[in-house]
């Protein structure tokens, strides 16, 4: 039986233990990748799909032209739209509802909209206490659009070369 000097040296000097200890110490002193979530927020992609919003033109007029493409393309059938004609011949929505309990956040509504009226904004913190609060009507969607307009416009501008 031959004596294995390399194996004995490795065993005697506890080389594996030293390598493991060194690796542990390297991670112990390195900066932590974890965010303290409620107090720190990480970056979001411009393509992030969060809470829905209806946008307005800079003059205050609603962008939605009641084409109902978003309603037709929604695979979850979460969008309901009623529309009427105006005196000038254009159409506008009288009712625009989204059932957020059905929504799967696929983004098809945003992609189908020819005037960028319906968008999925950057807000992902909209937990509710009751189910009824997840039924968004036109006023709630317009309020979301007004609240997040600056960030929505920036995200759409950043994503424009890829659309």
UniProtKB/Swiss-Prot annotation:
The lineage of its organism: Bacteria, Pseudomonadati, Pseudomonadota, Alphaproteobacteria, Rhodobacterales. Residues 54-84, 94-123 form the 4Fe-4S ferredoxin-type domain. Keywords: 4Fe-4S, Cell inner membrane, Cell membrane, Iron, Iron-sulfur, Membrane, Metal-binding, NAD, Quinone, Repeat, Translocase, Ubiquinone. It catalyses: a quinone + NADH + 5 H(+)(in) = a quinol + NAD(+) + 4 H(+)(out). NDH-1 is composed of at least 14 different subunits, Nqo1 to Nqo14. The complex has a L-shaped structure, with the hydrophobic arm (subunits Nqo7, Nqo8, Nqo10 to Nqo14) embedded in the inner membrane and the hydrophilic peripheral arm (subunits Nqo1 to Nqo6, Nqo9) protruding into the bacterial cytoplasm. The hydrophilic domain contains all the redox centers. Its EC number is 7.1.1.-. This is NADH-quinone oxidoreductase subunit 9. It comes from Paracoccus denitrificans. [4Fe-4S] cluster 1 binds at residues 64, 67, 70, 113. Its cofactor is [4Fe-4S] cluster. One of its GO terms (biological process) is aerobic respiration. GO terms for molecular function: 4 iron, 4 sulfur cluster binding; iron ion binding; NADH:ubiquinone reductase (non-electrogenic) activity; quinone binding. Binds 2 [4Fe-4S] clusters per subunit. GO terms for cellular component: plasma membrane. NDH-1 shuttles electrons from NADH, via FMN and iron-sulfur (Fe-S) centers, to quinones in the respiratory chain. The immediate electron acceptor for the enzyme in this species is believed to be ubiquinone. Couples the redox reaction to proton translocation (for every two electrons transferred, four hydrogen ions are translocated across the cytoplasmic membrane), and thus conserves the redox energy in a proton gradient.
